[in-house]
A protein has these predicted regions:
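N-terminal Rossmann NAD(P)H-binding glycine-rich loop of SDR-like oxidoreductase domains
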Residues: 5-25
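SDR active-site strand-loop-helix element
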Residues: 8, 33, 73-77, 111-117, ...
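Conserved glycine-rich Rossmann-like NAD(P)H-binding loop of the short-chain dehydrogenase/reductase
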Residues: 27-37
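Conserved Rossmann-fold NAD(P)-dependent oxidoreductase catalytic core, especially the SDR/UDP-sugar
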Residues: 94-132, 141, 146
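Substrate-positioning beta->alpha
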Residues: 159-164, 179-201, 208
């Protein structure tokens, strides 16, 4: 493929999977930008021939010269969890402002911005507020762009969310669940979402917004049971009152600089969102992978399921 693709936040869950897919599809000019040098090293080992750039987009630097009128820029960088509001402001808002300024100065053929379903959710936390602001920056930038809003994603190279829970389940005889665990989720398989991103890179639908929602509605507790099943584990699931669970999370956060699961995420889990999205087959040309098959591929694949990136 002749198009040059520049990916920000390239060493995270979406970025690792997207770059790997782009290389599988024959894209030769891929630039991966991330501030996490160790995770970029993992990416370099997975996808040979990718140009990797260690850079913090909130700070001026040589990275600002990486854009040109022949490039499609995929905006993935995001602060998803954290203890301090300023982390979200810095990495979701300030970094995006500087990125858009660099693109204005140098040019780009198109921007594919990955937002989040939280911008249309009932949640009100630092992640939601700053993702709303980030999306608005892109939408008002006057640059050619489209926006995709995925629901909770899972798959290879996931240091957070279901990936972390999957690994935690392997290490403990007891797995705690808040309340009855019947919090409806619409998880989206990362390889399916990357197929939508590739479509956007190739079709460049200007000023369009796509809500990309996992096809299966499933309760959180049933997701945990399915992960346990496909991995052949015998971990006991124990239900803990939601209030106590929240208090335990807040206490844990006092002693951890990077808590894997926060009280804000628990509130988002129990918010009761029910998202509607585009028909992925009609719009992007693919039918979503059946959920159990996707979970099995995510956590049992002999090539990639054991590859870890840092949070």
């Amino acid at each position: 493929m002749s198009v040059r693709v520049v990916v920000t936040g390239a060493a995270g869950l979406v970025g690792q999977n997207l770059v790997l897919m782009l290389k599988e599809l024959g894209y030769e000019k891929v630039v991966a930008i991330d501030k996490h040098a160790g995770n970029l090293e993992v990416l370099r080992g997975l996808a040979s021939g990718v140009e990797t750039v260690v850079a913090d987009l909130a700070v001026p630097g040589s990275w600002e010269g990486l854009f040109d009128l022949e490039s499609v820029v995929v905006v993935l960088h995001a602060q998803i969890t954290g203890k301090h509001p300023q982390e979200f402001v810095r990495n979701n808002i300030e970094a995006t402002k500087r990125l858009l300024e660099a693109i204005h100065a140098r040019g780009a053929r198109f921007i594919v911005h990955v937002s989040s379903s939280v911008v249309v959710s009932v949640a009100h936390d630092d992640y939601t507020r700053t993702k709303e602001a980030q999306e608005k920056l892109v939408a008002e930038s006057e640059l050619p762009h489209c926006i995709l809003r995925p629901t909770l994603m899972f798959g290879w190279f996931d240091p957070k969310h279901l990936g972390w829970l999957s690994r935690f389940m392997e290490k403990t005889p007891v797995f705690p669940i808040p309340g009855d665990g019947k919090f409806m989720r619409q998880p989206l398989y990362i390889r399916d979402f990357c197929r939508a991103l590739v479509w956007a890179i190739e079709h460049q639908p200007d000023r369009q917004v796509y809500d990309v929602v996992g096809a299966q509605r499933i309760d959180y507790v049933d997701i945990i049971r399915l992960i346990r099943k496909v991995k052949g584990l015998h971990t006991r699931i124990v239900h803990i009152p939601t209030g106590l669970f929240r208090a335990l999370l807040r206490t844990y956060a006092l002693f951890s600089s990077r808590p894997p699961f926060t009280a804000d995420q628990l509130d988002a889990l129990s918010a009761g969102d029910d998202f509607s999205g585009v028909d992925t087959e009609a719009v992007f040309g693919f039918r979503q992978t059946p959920f159990e098959e996707a979970v099995r591929e995510s956590y049992c694949d002999p090539r990639y399921s054991r590859v870890l990136v840092e949070r």
